[in-house]
Amino acid sequence: MGFDAIWISPIVDNRDGGYHGYWARNIYELNQNFGSEQDFIDMVSACHERNILVMVDVVANHMGNLDTNFGVNTPFNDGSHYHDWC
């Protein structure tokens, strides 16, 4: 196909139903819907063997919970990490 890079959705653990990667719940764990950490490493290695770059999208400005139960987020699991609700 001639491409030399792949850009994929965020791979961090998401809240239930967050298939797209933009409802982060735990930034230290991978979304199991996308496979294991080893699967990711293997995929990146296979791409690099073919001179294909892999870019992973990231969400740097929010977590994915829809309520005030901040305890489900890692590492930002306290309300003091967030602005007050508008």
PLM regions: where:
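Substrate-binding/active-site clefts of carbohydrate-active enzymes
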Residues: M1-C86
